[in-house]
């Protein structure tokens, strides 16, 4: 039965543009793509979009490390991501970037509306600052102990253990991820989104059916603990969009990231010359449906901040959030050392996309449970289901049809009632696809496949083929088998796009959900060719080994400090023990008249003063900034007479030279004169 066509916009969470796509990412994109392909088969208007999340300090710093601009890095990463998704047949209508004109305009529009409506608040805050790098530290560049559950090694914006969000200043024992230094507090004016104003709306939306029950229950905990205003600004230097009329202030990446859904759709509409669909889909009273597929780690942002931002700026809210769990491999977290941290591109060098699409689909449900990719079970299931049950059904019958009947199917079904049993299952299987009970859909389909194969076993066409005068029976039996195969592949089409294309070529007919009511009768099929190959554990072993080698290659420095300055010849412990390293306090620092390279440092060793000349002037053009700082010096180096005076030691610094010299400093708590061991 044909359904009333709906307008549907589907998104996946935006991959961050500083790393490759791996099998953890692919779970979400496969889940969404299967759902989208089913919706399209049912005749709905579906727009499936995504983009790279391309802003933030991590991208800025990684680009600096690579010696390229952030724009160049995110451009290259976008191409890599799109290639990976295309390789897995993820059928996006558009793949864009948050670093785009569309996203800038929409971010500014939403911010302006929120501000005009009184939902943006300004206040001065004390913020963590890296004294060694001279920069404010974004959330993800501070780590410490979660103030809520006391889990160690958590980022400065939210805890990956308990899901709580907080300010970086609330972290216990924070450390800069950039330098390892203990941050200091500095004041800065920031802009806040008044999330508590939307508490009543959000609680109603939470219980409206827009969220899975597990998510709604978790949100209730957050409501009970009280919503806080959300800091949406970051200080320069920052790679992102500058806030209007606020020089040196930038939108926090999590403000413009979800707006990227809108930006990508706007870009798609503009490409099509479509001037009406954007408003039709995003206006406050839109009757279109909006679905976000996301992982459970970003529920807080999508279930609180995002709908509140949309409500406050007079746009529509999502129809549903579809939240999934994490991927484990062989029962454990993905591991680089074990070779189970597998990139999407690496997978495609060893297996086809349909195999992973099928395995993930067979394990997915509408719940937020984690999915385990057991590689041995993967091989067994793909061979047992796709090869033995489904493809084998076609191969057992196609040969007789091709050879004995010139590829023409019988004019009537051998068992109309059995065929009706298969087509009647469309309601149950369709509902399972619709409700994202993918595992249930696969179980129903494979149960039918068992029935179809039993039918062929019982009818034994290979026996009938040898009996004189039974050509009509043989044609009817094999035609029945091929028609049952057609129904099964129609149900599996959202999952197995590549195999489906081969099947359509063989059947000489499109796999169409509504068309299965009518079997293929007196229809000519094409010559049968192998549709799918068995897989084995040797491929798995090669995949795991290749992943290990990629990790080794990534860890090996092709260029950089070790390549430019190889480690010196090995010394003995006794040689090293002769060097006396001490903590020193810089009491004074000044230029040396007549030298453009040296600074004169007066060092306090805790009761003894030293005069040291150091060639660090190019890196520290303001020597006064060094006063009061601690460093490390070689205290037992023989005094050296220089043109400007006597140098009584050497301070320790890293870097290749020039402006890239970095004076070493001990952690807080070290005292002048203490020995460095």
From Swiss-Prot:
Sorted keywords for this record are:
Aminoacyl-tRNA synthetase, ATP-binding, Cytoplasm, Ligase, Metal-binding, Nucleotide-binding, Protein biosynthesis, RNA-binding, tRNA-binding, Zinc
Is Membrane tagged as a keyword?
Answer: no
Q: Which residues does the UniProt record annotate as the domain tRNA-binding? A: 575-677
> Which Gene Ontology biological process is one annotated for this entry?
methionyl-tRNA aminoacylation
Residue numbers covered by motif 'KMSKS' region = 333-337
Class of this enzyme? ligase
What Pfam family is a match, any one?
tRNA-synt_1g
Any one cellular-component term (Gene Ontology): cytosol
* Cofactor info, note text: Binds 1 zinc ion per subunit.
**Enzyme Commission code:** 6.1.1.10
Q: Report motif location: 'HIGH' region.
A: 15-25
* UniProt KW Cytoplasm keyword: yes
Protein family according to the UniProt entry: Belongs to the class-I aminoacyl-tRNA synthetase family. MetG type 1 subfamily.
Assembly mode: Homodimer.
NCBIfam families reported for this sequence: metG, metG_C_term, PRK00133.1
Q: What does this protein do?
A: Is required not only for elongation of protein synthesis but also for the initiation of all mRNA translation through initiator tRNA(fMet) aminoacylation.
Q: What is this protein called?
A: Methionine--tRNA ligase
Q: Which organism is it from?
A: Salmonella enteritidis PT4 (strain P125109)
Origin organism lineage: Bacteria, Pseudomonadati, Pseudomonadota, Gammaproteobacteria, Enterobacterales
């Amino acid at each position: 039965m044909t359904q009333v066509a709906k307008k549907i916009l589907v998104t996946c969470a935006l991959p961050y543009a500083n790393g490759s796509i791996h099998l953890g990412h692919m779970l979400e994109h496969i889940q969404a793509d299967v759902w989208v392909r089913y919706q399209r088969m049912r005749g709905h208007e579906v727009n499936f979009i995504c983009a790279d999340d391309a802003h933030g300090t991590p991208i800025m710093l990684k680009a600096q490390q690579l010696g390229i601009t952030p724009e160049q890095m995110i451009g290259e990463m976008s191409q890599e991501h799109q290639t990976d998704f295309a390789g897995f047949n993820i059928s996006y209508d558009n793949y864009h970037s948050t670093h785009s004109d569309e996203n800038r305009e929409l971010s500014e529009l939403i911010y302006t509306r929120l501000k005009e409506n009184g939902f943006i608040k300004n206040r001065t805050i004390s913020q963590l600052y890296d004294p060694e790098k001279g920069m404010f530290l974004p959330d993800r560049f501070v780590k410490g102990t979660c103030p809520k559950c006391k889990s160690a090694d958590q980022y400065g914006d939210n805890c990956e253990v308990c899901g709580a969000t907080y300010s970086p200043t609330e972290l216990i024992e924070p450390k800069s991820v950039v330098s390892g230094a203990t941050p200091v507090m500095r004041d800065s004016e920031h802009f806040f989104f008044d999330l508590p104003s939307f508490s009543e709306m959000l609680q109603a939306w939470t219980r409206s059916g827009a969220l899975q029950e597990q998510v709604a229950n978790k949100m209730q905990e957050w409501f009970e603990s009280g919503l806080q205003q959300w800091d949406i600004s970051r200080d320069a230097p920052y790679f992102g969009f500058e806030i209007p009329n606020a020089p040196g202030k930038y939108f926090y990446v999590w403000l413009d990231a979800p707006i990227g859904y809108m930006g990508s759709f706007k870009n798609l509409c503009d490409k099509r010359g479509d001037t009406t669909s954007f408003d039709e889909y995003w206006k406050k009273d839109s009757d279109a449906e909006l679905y976000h597929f996301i992982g459970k780690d970003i529920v807080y942002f999508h279930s609180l901040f995002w709908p509140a931002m949309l409500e406050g700026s007079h746009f529509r809210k999502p129809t549903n959030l579809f939240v999934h769990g994490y991927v484990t491999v062989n029962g454990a977290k993905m591991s680089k050392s074990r070779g189970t941290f597998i990139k999407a591109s690496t997978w495609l060098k060893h297996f086809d996309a349909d195999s992973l699409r099928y395995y993930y689909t067979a394990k997915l449900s509408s719940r937020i449970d984690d999915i385990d990719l057991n590689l041995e079970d993967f091989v067994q299931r793909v061979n047992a289901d796709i090869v033995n049950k489904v493809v084998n059904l076609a191969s057992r019958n196609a040969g007789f049809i091709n050879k004995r009947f010139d590829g023409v199917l019988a004019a009537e079904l051998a068992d109309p009632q059995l065929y009706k049993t298969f087509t009647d299952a469309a309601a149950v299987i369709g509902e399972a696809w619709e409700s994202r009970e993918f595992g249930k859909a696969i179980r129903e389909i494979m149960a039918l496949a068992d029935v179809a194969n039993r039918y062929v076993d019982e009818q034994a066409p290979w026996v009938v083929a040898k009996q004189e005068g039974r050509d009509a029976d043989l044609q009817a039996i094999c035609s029945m088998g091929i028609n049952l195969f057609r129904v099964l592949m129609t149900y599996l089409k959202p999952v197995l796009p590549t195999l489906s294309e081969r099947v359509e070529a063989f059947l000489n007919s499109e796999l169409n959900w509504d068309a299965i009511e009518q079997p293929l009768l007196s229809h000519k099929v094409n010559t049968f060719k192998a549709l799918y190959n068995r897989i084995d554990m040797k491929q798995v072993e090669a995949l795991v080994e290749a992943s290990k080698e990629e990790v080794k290659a990534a860890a090996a420095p092709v260029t950089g400090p070790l390549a430019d300055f190889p480690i010196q010849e090995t010394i003995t412990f006794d040689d090293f023990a002769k060097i006396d390293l001490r903590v020193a306090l810089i009491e004074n620092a000044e230029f040396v008249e007549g030298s453009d390279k040296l600074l004169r440092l007066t060092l306090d060793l805790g009761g003894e003063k030293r005069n040291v000349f150091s060639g660090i002037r190019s890196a520290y053009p303001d020597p006064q900034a060094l006063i009061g700082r601690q460093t490390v010096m070689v205290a037992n180096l023989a005094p050296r007479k220089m043109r400007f005076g006597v140098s009584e030691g050497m301070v320790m610094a890293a870097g290749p030279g020039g402006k890239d010299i970095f004076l070493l400093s001990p952690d807080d708590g070290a005292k002048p004169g203490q020995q460095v061991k």
